[in-house]
UniProtKB/Swiss-Prot annotation:
Residues 173-263 form the SH2 domain. Its EC number is 2.7.10.2. It comes from Mus musculus. This is Tyrosine-protein kinase ABL2. The modification Phosphothreonine is found at residue 802. The gene is Abl2. One of its GO terms (cellular component) is phagocytic cup. CDD domains: PTKc_Abl (cd05052), SH2_ABL (cd09935), SH3_Abl (cd11850). A motif (Nuclear localization signal) lies at residues 659-661. Non-receptor tyrosine-protein kinase that plays an ABL1-overlapping role in key processes linked to cell growth and survival such as cytoskeleton remodeling in response to extracellular stimuli, cell motility and adhesion, receptor endocytosis, autophagy, DNA damage response and apoptosis. Coordinates actin remodeling through tyrosine phosphorylation of proteins controlling cytoskeleton dynamics like MYH10 (involved in movement); CTTN (involved in signaling); or TUBA1 and TUBB (microtubule subunits). Keywords: Acetylation, ATP-binding, Cell adhesion, Cytoplasm, Cytoskeleton, Kinase, Lipoprotein, Magnesium, Manganese, Metal-binding, Myristate, Nucleotide-binding, Phosphoprotein, SH2 domain, SH3 domain, Transferase, Tyrosine-protein kinase, Ubl conjugation. Residues 288-539 form the Protein kinase domain.
């Protein structure tokens, strides 16, 4: 707020801001309502939102105003800046509302005024002083420099340092295009009477006054009459905006108070380029003084330096001579020369004449975003700040998208933080200018796997949509205050998890809308992901449509009202809510935009988590591995005794994570097994019916209710369960009933917020107890934990998944999957369709059944059930999966009901626990049998009533305990690890060609579980909903690029697929695999595989029956299954799996095709099949 000595007139009428220089994007401005958290010194002088908020102080010739800088989209944040509140207040006091009322109106369009001081540095530049009048003579080629004449001479000055003399930007109170929430942010730390005039973002050209009074910010629309008069109240109209501001600075006249102190603007804009000479970026090395080192990397180091010409602190990126070619180094510099955006780190110059090479950029004093998030104060960096940061990054990426650039390394570590939470995207070493739709990286290029899109990992191809994927991961980093993505998951497992449909869980406290955006960014098909323009608009909409502060206050207030865990939260003054009556607005109701400061609760500015939690049904991703977990959502429950662990929330969840506390000793499996067997009376039911007035059990994303059969049971508590649920991303719009629950109850729509510390503890279920004081029950054992991992798998502690045991014991968990809660994108409907039917009652029958003998390799364990004409033992040797016979999955033509794993009928409308076994038997497009990802532990020598044979991803056999075995001793019941053994060569293939099209109705003929399996009756079985229709085709919106799928042998073709042609295209159909058909890698050579591929290619080109082509194709699939693990390079392995997946899908289409085999030119199915075979051959020959 510089004091105005001279006065410059203003043209009549409302003056609109004139474009000047490079206009930035509005993306850098947040749109959330917030007030500065307590305890933080408000940097009142910094304006970090607006693009055209240059400090206006126009004085007559010979007079000089204060040297206070301004803010602009091209802000170069210096390590120093405006002082704190005192300086802003002192300068505000000196402001005179009459500063621009007098003086002649200038009609010369070339007459400009200086906004900032500028010191000449050679190259014919001219020194100017703020407030000095200048006449513009011309511009350089890119318009970033203006040639001007002043009383001191003629020369070049930066274009963004001057403005037309009649522009609104000369005024100290005019801030240009600023959103409503950004204005509130600017005024939040100021005093009563602080104000600014801004242009509306949503309605360009519409001006408003934002005025702070008594902790609130009021917004008044400035109206314009037909005769160009401006007014706030209809009784007081003025010719110019300056007159209006002057009037309301003396009398309120309808405003809540008078206009006293313009909000300050203190940062100078960035000077683009070294000089006005176009494309001159080479700097003199002697102009840079190197200071201390900031950090180092693979290619060089980064230092703090001073650009002596401008006395400007800069960042200097150096490169080692032997690590990077000069051309590659210049490519990065060339990319940075072309980008100019307030949220992109600006290139200032380069030194490339001799090594070591320098890239000189603006300096961001707070370092990279990742470290900043990990070390910041949660009281300062609140949910609003996090959302603001994400908005800025989306704005920068939208700019790159429009410029047709790809970044290729977007992550929190490559974003830098400046004053007042300004974030800028940096590190353009991998960025490229796109000349087509995609960019293919050279062989051997390295990429950050956890941030790289699947198509980029598989094919080395990049597009702006692969940056969108990385942006979704970056959002997850922001929401978790800098946690590492996919915590506890090894790099080699990430791609395999993604192809199974796994996506990271919803961070604790993350609003559903933000998580929906993350999931949209993680769509498998690039075409299905949103553009950065859409993501940026989505963030802006979030700010405008709702108050984040109010959501934080509402969510945390609800939790605090029911919990005694959060008494430490600081008692901040409560701000008035929107519903409170506005003061002094009776005579100005038509112009008041509305009360804008959201009411904040005592906890709103100190939320330990990044974003707020939702009380509505939201999508959660699977439970995470044990290596990294966060606090349990149930830590806020009143009954602290029943939680598996406690923790101090005072430091925020991430600080607790960094302490690396040791997890408690997990419960013994034997006792847990006995507990579940000996206490069959315990029932569990979790419902997903959420409402804004959720009960205490709902506070963490799910509710727990006792079984209807036993109403006296207290609600069970679940520490880790987001089970069958509905994903909220765009591709799940057609999904079945997710979080809203179903008529049948049961495991329906569980969401819950899983964090690394939560799952670091034992994942399990607390059973309902007849009395609340009975605390003797123990958590369920981790069914797939590291203690029973196969010794042959690396990173055991990171790869194992902690899964709750199935309390119904109606299914066998035969395979390690990502989580019980992970639902593949393409199969959400099917995941919601699965629920175990009512099972046999009592535990005694399980003890009375004779033990089943260990089955030989290649055989399958069939469930003990009544003979079914639809499924006979002779028909099904190839149908079983790892020892469980899976009946045809798909509704048949005659309306038969689908049978689930272990012969348990499934209801089409009910939601069920998507157990690992079910994932094997039902979800074909999301599981890769050849990928060693989180697979079930190897068990040996178990005294189970029945021993079933399972297979891991390598085709190795292992034995499984029955679900409810009778335990006689502790140690004997504990599963033991055995080293996997290679499977023998496959036996002759048996095919099922005919099969009846119906199967028994589960309501009329309940099926029995496998021998030795105890299946107590549960509420889920008793509350079956009516069967619903099964879709006859793939789910709408199925990704263009299906997840890579390792082939399945011909014997695994379900008879339902042959009986029903349309069923062949179902996404949710599961082709099961006979374990013994795995061909070991040492028996498949490259030559044999290529020979088999040539054989299939030859068969395709000849008129042969479809059945013969299918046989040959499945033979090739078997060869591929055995060969995939011998591919040395990871990227080639990814591409190979993708090609094999396409081949498998092509064979399925051929199998159900009614068209007779012909030549590839006439049959599109054959064309597709031939291209798949060729792609496999190409990958193998690389």
């Amino acid at each position: 707020m510089g004091q105005q000595v001279g006065r410059v007139g203003e043209a009549p009428g409302l003056q609109q801001p004139q474009p000047r220089g490079i206009r930035g994007s509005s993306a850098a401005r947040p749109s959330g309502r917030r007030r500065d958290p307590a305890g933080r010194t408000a940097d009142a002088g910094f304006n970090v939102f607006t693009q055209h908020d240059h400090f206006a102080s126009c004085v007559e010739d010979g007079f000089e105003g204060d040297k206070t800088g301004g803010s602009s989209p091209e802000v170069l944040h210096r390590p120093f800046g405006c002082d704190a509140e005192s300086q802003a207040l002192n300068e505000a006091i000196r402001w005179s509302s009459k500063e621009n009322l007098l003086g002649a109106t200038e009609s010369d369009p070339n007459l400009f005024v200086a906004l900032y001081d500028f010191v000449a540095s050679g190259d014919n530049t001219l020194s100017i002083t703020k407030g000095e009048k200048l006449r513009v003579l011309g511009y350089n080629q890119n318009g970033e420099w203006s040639e001007v004449r002043s009383k001191n001479g003629q020369g070049w000055v930066p274009s963004n340092y001057i403005t037309p003399v009649n522009s609104l930007e000369k005024h100290s109170w005019y801030h240009g295009p600023v959103s409503r929430s950004a204005a509130e942010y600017l005024l939040s730390s100021l005093i009563n009477g602080s104000f600014l005039v801004r242009e509306s973002e949503s309605s360009p050209g519409q001006l408003s006054i934002s005025l702070r009074y008594e902790g609130r910010v009021y917004h008044y629309r400035i109206n314009t009459t037909t005769d160009s008069k401006v007014y706030v109240t209809a009784e007081s109209r003025f010719s110019t905006l300056a007159e209006l501001v002057h009037h309301h600075s003396t009398v309120a006249d309808g405003l809540v108070t008078t206009l006293h102190y313009p909000a300050p603007k203190c940062n100078k804009p960035t000077v683009y380029g070294v000089s006005p000479i176009h494309d001159k970026w080479e700097m003199e090395r002697t102009d840079i003084t190197m200071k201390h080192k900031l950090g180092g990397g693979q290619y060089g180091e980064v230092y703090v330096g001073v650009w002596k010409k401008y006395s400007l602190t800069v960042a200097v990126k150096t490169f080692k001579e032997d690590t990077m070619e000069v051309e590659e180094f210049l490519k990065e510099a060339a990319v940075m020369k072309e980008i100019k955006h307030p949220n992109l780190v600006q290139l200032l110059g380069v030194c490339t004449l001799e090594p070591p090479f320098y890239i000189v950029t603006e300096y961001m004093p707070y370092g990279n975003l990742l470290d900043y998030l990990r070390e910041c104060s949660r009281e300062e960096v609140t949910a609003v700040v996090l959302l603001y940061m994400a908005t800025q990054i989306s704005s920068a990426m939208e700019y790159l998208e429009k410029k047709n650039f790809i970044h290729r390394d977007l992550a929190a570590r490559n974003c830098l933080v400046g004053e007042n939470h300004v974030v800028k995207v940096a590190d353009f070493g991998l960025s490229r200018l796109m000349t087509g739709d995609t960019y293919t990286a050279h062989a051997g290029a390295k990429f950050p796997i956890k941030w790289t899109a699947p198509e980029s990992l598989a094919y080395n191809t990049f597009s702006i949509k692969s940056d969108v994927w990385a942006f979704g991961v970056l959002l997850w980093e922001i929401a978790t205050y800098g946690m590492s993505p996919y915590p506890g998951i090894d790099l080699s497992q990430v791609y395999d998890l993604l192809e199974k449909g796994y996506r990271m869980e919803q961070p604790e406290g993350c609003p559903p809308k933000v998580y929906e955006l993350m999931r949209a960014c993680w769509k498998w098909s690039p075409a299905d992901r949103p553009s950065f323009a859409e993501t940026h608009q989505a963030f802006e909409t979030m700010f405008h449509d709702s108050s984040i502060s109010e959501e934080v206050a509402e969510e945390l207030g609800r939790t605090a009202s029911s919990s005694s865990v959060v008494p430490y939260l600081p008692r901040l003054p409560l701000l008035p809510s929107k519903t409170r009556t506005l003061r002094k607005q009776g005579e100005n109701k038509e112009n008041l935009d509305g009360g804008l400061d959201a009411a904040e609760s005592l906890a709103s500015s100190s939320a330990p988590a990044g974003f707020i939690r939702s009380t509505q049904a939201s999508s959660g991703s699977p439970a995470l591995p044990r290596k990294q977990r966060d606090k349990s959502p149930s830590s806020l429950l009143e009954d602290a005794k029943e939680t598996c662990f406690t923790r101090d929330r005072k430091g925020g969840f991430f600080s607790s994570f960094m302490k690396k506390r040791n997890a408690p000793t997990p419960p013994k499996r034997s006792s847990s097994f006995r507990e579940m067997e000996n206490q069959p009376h315990k029932k569990y039911e979790l419902t997903g019916n959420f409402s804004p007035v959720a009960s205490l059990q709902n506070a963490d994303g799910f509710s727990v209710a006792p079984s209807q059969q036993e109403p006296n049971l207290v609600p069970a508590k679940c520490y880790g369960g987001s089970f069958a649920q509905r994903n909220l991303c765009a591709d799940d719009d057609s999904g079945g009933g997710g979080g809203s629950g179903t008529a049948g109850g049961g495991w329906s729509g569980i969401t819950g917020f899983f964090t690394p510390r939560l799952i670091k503890k034992t994942l399990g279920l607390r059973a309902g107890k007849p009395t609340a004081s009975d605390d003797t029950s123990k958590p369920f054992p981790r069914s797939n934990s590291t203690s029973s991992m196969s010794s042959g798998l690396p990173e055991q502690d990171r790869m194992a998944m902690t899964l709750p045991r199935n309390c119904q014991r109606s299914k066998l968990q035969l395979e390690r999957t990502v989580s019980t809660s992970s639902q593949p994108e393409e199969n959400v409907d099917r995941a919601n369709d699965m629920l175990p039917k009512k099972s046999e009652e009592g535990a005694a029958p399980a003890r009375e059944r004779p033990k089943a003998k260990l089955l030989p390799r290649g055989a399958t364990a069939l469930p003990l059930r009544a003979p079914d004409p639809a499924i006979t033992e002779s028909d099904s040797p190839g149908v079983g999966v790892a020892g469980v016979a899976a009946a045809p999955k798909g509704k048949e033509r005659n309306g038969g009901t689908r049978l689930g794993v272990a012969g348990v009928p499934e209801d089409g409308e009910q939601l069920g626990w998507s157990s690992p076994a079910k994932a094997v038997a039902v979800l074909p497009t999301t599981h890769n049998h050849k990928v060693p990802v989180l697979i079930s532990p190897t068990l040996k020598h178990t005294p189970a009533d029945v021993q079933l044979i399972g297979t891991d991803s390598q085709g190795n056999k292992f034995k499984l305990l029955s679900e409810h075995q009778v335990t006689s001793s502790g140690d004997k019941d504990r599963p033991r690890r055995v080293k996997p053994k290679c499977a023998p060569p496959p036996p002759p293939v048996m095919r099922l060609l005919q099969h009846p099209s119906t199967c028994s109705d589960p309501e009329e003929e309940p099926t029995a579980p496998p021998a030795g399996q105890h299946t107590p009756e549960t509420q889920e079985g008793g509350k079956k909903a009516a069967p619903g229709p099964v879709p006859s085709s793939g789910k709408p919106g199925r990704p263009v690029m299906p997840p890579p799928q390792v082939p399945l042998p011909t014997s695994s073709i379900s008879p339902a697929k042959m009986a029903n042609g349309t069923a062949g295209t179902k996404v949710a159909l599961r082709k099961t695999k006979q374990a013994a058909e795995k061909i070991s890698a040492d028996k498949i050579s490259k030559e044999a595989l290529l020979e088999c591929a040539d054989l299939l290619s030859s068969a395709i080109t000849e008129p042969v029956p479809n059945s013969q082509l299918v046989d040959t194709g499945h033979q090739l699939l078997d060869y591929c299954s055995g060969y995939v693990d011998s591919i040395p390079q990871t990227r080639n392995k990814f591409a190979f799996r993708e090609a094999v997946s396409k081949l498998e899908l092509s064979l399925q289409e051929l199998q159900v095709s009614s068209t007779a085999a012909g030549v590839p030119g006439t049959n599109p199915v054959l064309n597709n099949l031939l291209s798949c075979v060729q792609e496999i051959s190409d990958v193998v020959q690389r």
